[in-house]
């Protein structure tokens, strides 16, 4: 099984994803680590990625996931078509949607320095977000341990 922890930047994908992978004893994969240099440069310049930027990245992630038996992937996966591309050819993918309101996420982003995701891109991420229909939905205003415990319980069902 692959668990994809998804949501906008600042929702806690990496933090919760790493903790979940530790809890389950699964491999953790951060999608951000697999962006090509051109994507990183574009985001660092405050420009949102478009589909042409994303497809090769999503294809790379899909290839990595196909090699895994059990893994947690932290990935924005904002649109349904991106999620479809990620899951293509994989037997079981569970989506974990980290949901938080704009003000909460903005305050989190203001407190951190992401290597290439300026907080100015948050509005474009919320605008692009297509919440998944079938997902484990987690309210990220709860603490990390509570979020991880809730996700682990749902994945065990």
Model-derived features: positions:
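Conserved lysine of the Walker
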Residues: 13
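Loop/turn-to-beta-strand initiation segments
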Residues: 68-71, 94
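Conserved phosphate-donor/acceptor-positioning beta-strand/loop module used by diverse small-molecule
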Residues: 89-108
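Conserved substrate/cofactor phosphate-moiety recognition/catalytic segment
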Residues: 18-60
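Small-molecule kinase domains that catalyze NTP-dependent phosphoryl transfer to phosphate-bearing small molecules
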Residues: 111-150
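Hydrophobic anchor at the beta1->P-loop junction of P-loop NTPases
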Residues: 5
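Walker A (P-loop) ATP-phosphate-binding motif of ABC ATPase nucleotide-binding domains
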Residues: 2
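P-loop (Walker A) phosphate-binding loop of NTP-binding proteins
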Residues: 8
């Amino acid at each position: 099984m692959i668990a994809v922890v998804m949501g906008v930047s600042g929702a806690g994908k990496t933090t919760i994803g790493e903790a979940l992978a530790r809890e389950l004893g699964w491999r953790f994969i951060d999608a951000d680590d697999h962006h090509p240099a051109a994507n990183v440069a574009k985001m660092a310049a405050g420009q949102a990625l478009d589909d042409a930027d994303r497809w090769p990245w999503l294809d790379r992630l899909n290839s990595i996931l196909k090699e895994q038996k059990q893994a947690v992937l932290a990935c924005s996966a904002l649109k349904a078509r991106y999620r479809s591309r990620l899951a293509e050819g994989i037997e079981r993918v569970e989506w974990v949607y980290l949901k938080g309101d704009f003000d909460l996420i903005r305050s989190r982003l203001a407190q951190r320095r992401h290597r290439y995701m300026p907080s100015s891109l948050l509005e474009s991420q919320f605008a692009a977000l297509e919440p998944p229909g079938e997902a484990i939905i987690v309210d990220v205003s709860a603490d990390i341990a509570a979020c991880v415990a809730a996700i682990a319980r749902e994945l065990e069902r």
